[in-house]
């Protein structure tokens, strides 16, 4: 539930920094900035369960203090580090370009002061990744047009496009993407390999993916390797890509490790609300590996075979069947079989190309009634047998 805890078991980042660097090298307050190498300022935005923030901006008093610190630091040619003590994303555009580093600790708990101090002094190499997206502007948020709603109710219109899925679908560049996070070292992710480039999902086959990760920096650190999957051309509405796996590994300078993932049918399935089922579509999937949703280092293609409700049937739209040379040839043959010319489809393709083929065929005028039923059923049987793996 929701509660508020008052305790004397908390840590001050200032006191912990003094323990690490010594009292003589640690100063508190803006008036002491001239004696330091860098200014570290903590800003906060309240947030809690059971209520919403009115926006993404930091409180006015926090922004004012932050701006004073930045102005004075620039005058004295000092570095500025901002520690974000927040519940979720905030608008950083007002100051991000004017500071040297941002450490987002969210709500770290009673040892948060010590954890932050140890990171700032290099005793701990940060390795966290954002579990959400920091938008570049509040208006970029998926819910911007719906919040705060009316009469105490908010309409959630994002559907499946929540978080990074929304920003990628709308091609909106965020301030900091889902999965983003820096370290005191650098990593190189390369050489994505699949043990097979085809997968029969109906036979419960799995595909094993491996990728090389190398620490190309000067200190030991941890990297979170993220696996995303994209259905390149799907029938069902889907995000551009979705996170399907991740592994966190520690590497010494120059060290390289092989990170492995297993791709299963479940990773390729999406829920169809119309039919109320999880479905795995046949076709081309792209396997993507990187260290954030917008930093993809390598990719590989996987062809998947699977029988599903999206296989060719009387429900399939005319355009999809006509775009496939195999089913187009079958359709033209069927049109001829009922005594019609293929040009009769011209108007349908221009005005009603997204109609189900079953509706199109039933509405064709002057089709031979004796041949129609048998020819149509044979057509449906033949298109249902087509392998859509390579479509």
Language-model regions: role of each:
Residues 1-391:
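C-terminal non-catalytic regions of proteins with extracellular/luminal or membrane-system context
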């Amino acid at each position: 539930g929701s509660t508020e805890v008052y305790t004397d078991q908390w840590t001050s980042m200032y006191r912990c920094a003094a323990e690490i660097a010594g009292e003589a090298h640690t100063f508190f307050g803006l008036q002491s900035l001239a004696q330091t190498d860098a200014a570290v300022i903590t800003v906060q935005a309240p947030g809690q369960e059971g209520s919403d923030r009115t926006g993404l901006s930091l409180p006015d008093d926090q922004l004012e203090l932050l701006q004073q610190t930045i102005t004075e630091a620039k005058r004295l040619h000092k570095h500025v580090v901002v520690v974000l003590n927040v519940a979720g994303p905030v608008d950083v555009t007002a100051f991000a370009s004017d500071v040297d580093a941002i450490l987002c600790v969210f709500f770290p708990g009673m040892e948060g002061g010590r954890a932050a101090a140890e990171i700032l002094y290099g005793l701990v190499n940060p390795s966290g990744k954002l579990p959400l997206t920091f938008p570049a502007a509040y208006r970029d948020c998926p819910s911007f047009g719906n919040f705060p709603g009316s009469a105490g109710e908010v309409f959630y219109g994002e559907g499946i496009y929540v978080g990074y899925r929304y920003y990628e679908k709308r091609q909106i560049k965020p301030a900091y993407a889902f999965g983003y996070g820096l370290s005191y070292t650098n990593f190189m992710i390369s050489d994505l390999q699949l043990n097979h480039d085809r997968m029969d999902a109906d036979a419960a086959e799995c595909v094993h993916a491996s990728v090389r990760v190398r620490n190309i920096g000067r200190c030991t650190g941890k990297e979170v390797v993220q696996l995303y999957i994209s259905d390149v051309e799907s029938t069902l509405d889907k995000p551009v890509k979705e996170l399907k796996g991740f592994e966190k590994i520690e590497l010494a300078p120059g060290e390289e490790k092989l990170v492995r993932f297993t791709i299963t049918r479940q990773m390729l399935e999406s829920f169809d609300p119309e039919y109320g089922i999880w479905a795995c579509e046949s076709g081309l999937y792209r396997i993507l590996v990187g260290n954030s949703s917008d930093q993809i280092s390598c990719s590989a293609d996987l062809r998947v075979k699977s029988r599903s409700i999206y296989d060719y049937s009387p429900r399939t739209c005319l355009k999809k069947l006509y775009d496939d040379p195999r089913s187009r040839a079958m359709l033209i043959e069927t049109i001829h079989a009922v005594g019609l010319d293929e040009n009769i489809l011209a108007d349908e393709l221009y005005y009603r190309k997204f109609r189900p083929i079953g509706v199109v065929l039933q509405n064709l005028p002057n089709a031979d009634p004796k041949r129609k039923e048998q020819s149509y059923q044979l057509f449906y049987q033949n298109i249902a047998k087509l392998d859509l793996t390579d479509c």
